[in-house]
Amino acid sequence: MANAIHVTSEIGKLKTVMLHRPGKEIENITPDSMERLLFDDIPYLPIAQKEHDFFAKTLTDQGIEVIYFEKLAADALSDDGVRKEFLNRMIAESGYAVGVIHDALMEYLYAMDPQMMINQIIEGVRASDVNIVTPDLQSVSENTDWPFLMDPMPNAYFTRDPQASIGDGLSINKMTFEARMRESLITEYIMNYNPRFAGKVKVWRDRNHRTHIEGGDELVLNDHVLAIGISQRTTANAIEDIARNLFKDSNYDTIIAISIPHNHAMMHLDTVFTMINYEQFTVHPAILTGDGKVDNWVLHPGKDGEITMEHHTDIKEVLKKALNKSEIDLIPTGNGDPIVAPREQWNDGSNTLSIAPGVVVTYDRNYVSNDLLRQHGILVHEVRSSELSRGRGGPRCMSCPIVREDI
């Protein structure tokens, strides 16, 4: 039987991918809540949905199976006992472990069918929707200026981050910011209780940690090499932790930890660096020094479960050695222009989704970067992006590969 998850590269022909179609959670962003919910702008939902449907169709037209996060979650929660356990944890992680608000939310959500319940949780639950019959101190002292008892999850359409497929398993990630932490709880239940995955996948690292790692920083370069960003959203300690697990229980023996600026514009490694062919990568010039260097550390398994570590700055040489290539082609976002590069990187010009070696999906708005990719022999499928890009994530961010062919 084929493995439920199988991803041994960034570029192997994509067979199955998990998406989330943006829903009403997008319309529950307000100017006052944008910072709290990690948004810089408010997408126009009807157009964002059309753009997302175009993205999904672009993938299915290439023979790729598209499965949806929200549907997988509903199927995982068909059992009443599992659904009740899930709701207890979800409500607790929303700030209500016990009390009348917890009980009112449980009554409100448990009455729904699993699909409606998941959709409502992602959309957010307004205080006005829930009937609190006998108030307690927590309920009467709740911030009346904030309309939600359970915050919306507008970042859910970036399915890359709450988990990362690696080999025949995945990491279920401890997210950095509160706005996204509950997303990976849904992943946990999908993997534990959806028949497609239950009992069939290895979990290299679960979400029950103090240190953070997110899927946008986890790049699977081949069947034994990973690149992981040390970033705003992923800590060095988390990288060492997952390295120990992978070195012990998998074929992975090399992790390249790449240090990038810790800011919102470059929140993950895949916003500035992605693999698009056997020896070709996109790179945002701003992460490199004038002579093309970037701090990176190569981790290998040592004795007795320890990790050996070597510091380097020449990323080309590190990649050539790790991937056994004579040359590495780093293709600069925006052709390296000091104005075009940061503009197109802001709109995810570096965030390419490889669907086969030398074949990528990109946002249409990044035309300078797209033309340069074509000049380097890459086949580019452009997708519409006027509203989706307002969330600060591109095609790689919006997709979680589940199965790829080996390269």
Swiss-Prot record:
Pathway, per UniProt? Amino-acid degradation; L-arginine degradation via ADI pathway; carbamoyl phosphate from L-arginine: step 1/2
Class of the enzyme per the UniProt entry, highest EC level:
hydrolase
| One GO CC annotation | cytoplasm
Q: Which SUPFAM superfamilies match?
A: Pentein (SSF55909)
What keyword terms does UniProt attach to this protein? Arginine metabolism, Cytoplasm, Hydrolase
Active site: residue positions:
397
UniProt xrefs under InterPro entries: Arg_deiminase
Catalyzes what?
L-arginine + H2O = L-citrulline + NH4(+)
For this chain, one GO molecular function annotation is: arginine deiminase activity
EC number(s) recorded for this UniProt protein:
3.5.3.6
The subcellular localization recorded is:
Cytoplasm
The record ties this protein, via NCBIfam families, to: arcA, PRK01388.1
Family (UniProt): Belongs to the arginine deiminase family.
Q: What's the protein here called? A: Arginine deiminase
**Which source organism?**
Pediococcus pentosaceus (strain ATCC 25745 / CCUG 21536 / LMG 10740 / 183-1w)
What phylogenetic lineage does the species belong to? Bacteria, Bacillati, Bacillota, Bacilli, Lactobacillales
